[in-house]
Every structure is written in structure tokens, then in C-alpha cells.
């Protein structure tokens, strides 16, 4: 019987560990099941198909038309005789574009769209690294808040139960008792709010990964966090050249410029080479009798645009404004990136100091808790004071963990700007987690 219970406990513990997810589980799951990633991947494939469609415009267009007819002559007046007969014909047409100046501009535009889609895909995969960490950090903070809420609720329950005993013995009034009751009931509501917030974060993870999170790890608050230092000017200079969003914006400028050039080129003539081969076979019965005919033609088609109601001129003007907007967006993005880098560096420096302060605060509260715990063993402190000390310790611990997670998240963002962000970064954070 004892062995059976032991095995059951081991199975429960192992099951809990198997179902618990870490940051890498969230990230790997997102690579396979994140819907936004699937859409961006399909967009990248679509851009390749658009490029193939554009490049195919330079190749000849070949078509075959076949026709068969059976003619029934009901009445005929004229020389000779004519009976029912049939006609079979086929025509092979080849059209080879020779001069279309806009083709190369359209091809350059399609090529830039392919490059942009690849950059967007790689950028989104990097964003998945940061988003995985951010969602997991939110889970940790929400779960820690629920745990602290439970301790606070226990403390309020002890105070309320003590107040009821004091009221029964006539030491406090019903007004004071109601205060303890209201505090307890309010704490119950606060705890339920924390539980609801935890569930909402779980749903965010479900949307992100398509998987329910049953259990998670926590951050080892005693571990030393490696603190990086960033130079703002160096980071800004590097980001303005190598950041994926900057590269994508530069390609937007190229795309709009090629579109404008293509629209301008459509004012010019186009030249096509046309060749046809015709075959017809008419059975006997027609006025001219049975006959077979083969013929071929070859020629050039020149299309000179003269008047289109101002349509093409308007398209050129439209594309010119798009080109200007693309350059404006690029300039605005550069300004935004500069601001974001400076904000992140300032937050990074602030959070480094805050983590040190929170760690000192935790050490002080932990020392107070140990003192009260030891004093409670010899009757110096009540159960209420022990619970309050436990709650204060948990709050201090949660504050330290939250500040540390905020620091790690800002550090990931700064690594993205420096193009040093990789999966190894969240693997390092993963090793800081404990059960």
C-alpha cells in the first residue's frame, strides 16, 4: 500500500513536470502554430509567384485554336452544285514582345517585393523570440501575483477570525468587526481579479501558440543577472544600417520608384512580333470541292499610345506621391528607431539600478521574515504577524522578479537593434528558470 502511494506521487510529480512549459516550449510552438507567422510565410510565397508572373511577360505567348464545322445545305442557287460538307481548321499563333520599356521596371519592382517579404519574414521570426519571452514573463508575474494574493487572503482570514473571537468576548464593537469582514471580502475580490488576469495572459499565450499552458516555471530570484552596457551612438549607427525594418523601408522606396518609372514608360510605344500558321481542311460537297489549305503570316505590331483620357498621366502622378511618401516614411522610421533606442537604453540603465534596489529591499524583508519566524517559535509573534511578514516577503520577491524580467526584456529589444538577437538569448534566460 505504501509503495502504491509512493508510485502515485511520483507519477503526479512527473506529469506536472511534463505539462509545464518553459520559454523555449512557447517559442518552438509559435514557429509551428502561430497564425501571423503562417500568413507572413504565405505572403513571402505570394511575392515569389508575383515575380514569376512578371518575368513571364517577356516570353512568347503561344496559343492554338482548333475548329470543326459541319454545314448542311438546305437550298442552293448558283453555278455548280453544292452538297453537305464539313470544315476543320486549326491556327497556331505566337506573339513575342520585342519592346516594352516598362517590363524591366516592373521586374525590378517584383524583385524588391520578394526581398522585402523575406526580410519581413526574418524580422517576424526575431519578434517571435521577444514576444515569447514577453508572454512568458507576463505569465510569471501574473502567477506570482496570484500566489501573493492567496497569502494576503490567508492573512485577512486570520485577522477576521481573530476579530470574531474578540467581538464574541466583547473586546471590539460590531463596527470594528465589519471593517475586518469588509477587508477580507475585498481581498477575496482582489484575488479573483488576479486569477482572471492570469487566465487572460494564458489566453494570450494560447492565441500566440495554439496551446494551453498548464504550468510554468519561475525566475530564480537569487541568480546573478549578467548586466550588459550599450553605447547609444554606436547602437543607433548600426541600427540605421542593419535593422530589418530599415531595410524593408528602403525597399519600399525602391518599389515606389520602380512603379513610377514603369508608369512613365507606359507612355512609350510597344512592339510585338506576331506569327501565325493556319490549316484548314474542307471535305467534298462544297462549291469548290474538297480542299486543304495551309498558310502562315509574320508581322510586327506597333502600339503607340496617343490619348488615354489622362489616365496614364494620373498614374504617374499617383506613383510620384507614393514615392515621396515612401521616403517620408523612411525618414520617420529612422527618427522613431533613434527615439526607441534612446528610450530602451535609458530604461535599461534605470532597471539595472532598480534591480539592485529591489534586491536590497528583498534581503531586508527576508531578514525581517526570518527574525519574526524565529521569534514566533518562542511565542514573541502572533500568527497574524507571521502571515503579514510572509506576505511582505512574497511582495518583495515578486517586485524583484518583475524588475529583473523587465530588464531582461529591454535587453532583448536592444539586442534586436544591434542585430545580435538570436535563439541563444532566450535559451540563456531559460536556464535562469526554476520549478
Region roles according to the model:
Residues 21, 25, 121, 127-238, ...:
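Periplasmic alpha-helical coiled-coil/stalk elements that build and connect Gram-negative outer-membrane
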Residues 65-96, 220-229, 261, 274-308, ...:
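Small/polar, glycine/serine/threonine/aspartate-rich low-complexity segments that form flexible
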Residues 22, 29, 36, 99, ...:
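Surface positions of alpha-helical coiled-coils, especially the charged/polar e/g heptad sites
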Residues 39-54, 124, 128-149, 158, ...:
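Amphipathic alpha-helical coiled-coil segments
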Amino acid at each position: 500500500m505504501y509503495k502504491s502511494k509512493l508510485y502515485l506521487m511520483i507519477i503526479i510529480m512527473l506529469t506536472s513536470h511534463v505539462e509545464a512549459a518553459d520559454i523555449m516550449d512557447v517559442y518552438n510552438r509559435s514557429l509551428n502554430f502561430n497564425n501571423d507567422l503562417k500568413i507572413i510565410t504565405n505572403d513571402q510565397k505570394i511575392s515569389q509567384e508575383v515575380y514569376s508572373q512578371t518575368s513571364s511577360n517577356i516570353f512568347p505567348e503561344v496559343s492554338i485554336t482548333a475548329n470543326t464545322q459541319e454545314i448542311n445545305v438546305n437550298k442552293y442557287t448558283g453555278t455548280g452544285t453544292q452538297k453537305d460538307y464539313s470544315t476543320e481548321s486549326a491556327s497556331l499563333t505566337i506573339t513575342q514582345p520585342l519592346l516594352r520599356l516598362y517590363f524591366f521596371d516592373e521586374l525590378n519592382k517584383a524583385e524588391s517585393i520578394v526581398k522585402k517579404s523575406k526580410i519581413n519574414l526574418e524580422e517576424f521570426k526575431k519578434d517571435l523570440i521577444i514576444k515569447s519571452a514577453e508572454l512568458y514573463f507576463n505569465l510569471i508575474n501574473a502567477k506570482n501575483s496570484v500566489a501573493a494574493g492567496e497569502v494576503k487572503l490567508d492573512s485577512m482570514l486570520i485577522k477576521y477570525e481573530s476579530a470574531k473571537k474578540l467581538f464574541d468576548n466583547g473586546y471590539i464593537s460590531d463596527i470594528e468587526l465589519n471593517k475586518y469582514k469588509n477587508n477580507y471580502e475585498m481581498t477575496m475580490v482582489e484575488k479573483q481579479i488576479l486569477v482572471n488576469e492570469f487566465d487572460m495572459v494564458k489566453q494570450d499565450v494560447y492565441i500566440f501558440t495554439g496551446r494551453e499552458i498548464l504550468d510554468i516555471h519561475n525566475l530564480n530570484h537569487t541568480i546573478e543577472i549578467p548586466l550588459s552596457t550599450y553605447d547609444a551612438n554606436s547602437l543607433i549607427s548600426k541600427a540605421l544600417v542593419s535593422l530589418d525594418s530599415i531595410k524593408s523601408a528602403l525597399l519600399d522606396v525602391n518599389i515606389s520608384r520602380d512603379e513610377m518609372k514603369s508608369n512613365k514608360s507606359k507612355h512609350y510605344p510597344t512592339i510585338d512580333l506576331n506569327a501565325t500558321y493556319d490549316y484548314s481542311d474542307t471535305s467534298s460537297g462544297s462549291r469548290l470541292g474538297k480542299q486543304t489549305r495551309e498558310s502562315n503570316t509574320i508581322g510586327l505590331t506597333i502600339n503607340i499610345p496617343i490619348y488615354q483620357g489622362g489616365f496614364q498621366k494620373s498614374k504617374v502622378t499617383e506613383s510620384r506621391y507614393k514615392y515621396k511618401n515612401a521616403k517620408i516614411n523612411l525618414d520617420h522610421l529612422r527618427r522613431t528607431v533613434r527615439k526607441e533606442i534612446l528610450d530602451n537604453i535609458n530604461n535599461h540603465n534605470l532597471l539595472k539600478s532598480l534591480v539592485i534596489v529591489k534586491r536590497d529591499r528583498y534581503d531586508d524583508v527576508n531578514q525581517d521574515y526570518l527574525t519574526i519566524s524565529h521569534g514566533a517559535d518562542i511565542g514573541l509573534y502572533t500568527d497574524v504577524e507571521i502571515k503579514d511578514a510572509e506576505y511582505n516577503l512574497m511582495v518583495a520577491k515578486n517586485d524583484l522578479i518583475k524588475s529583473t524580467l523587465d530588464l531582461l526584456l529591454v535587453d532583448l529589444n536592444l539586442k534586436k537593434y544591434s542585430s545580435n538577437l538570436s535563439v541563444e538569448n532566450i535559451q540563456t534566460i531559460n536556464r535562469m528558470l526554476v520549478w
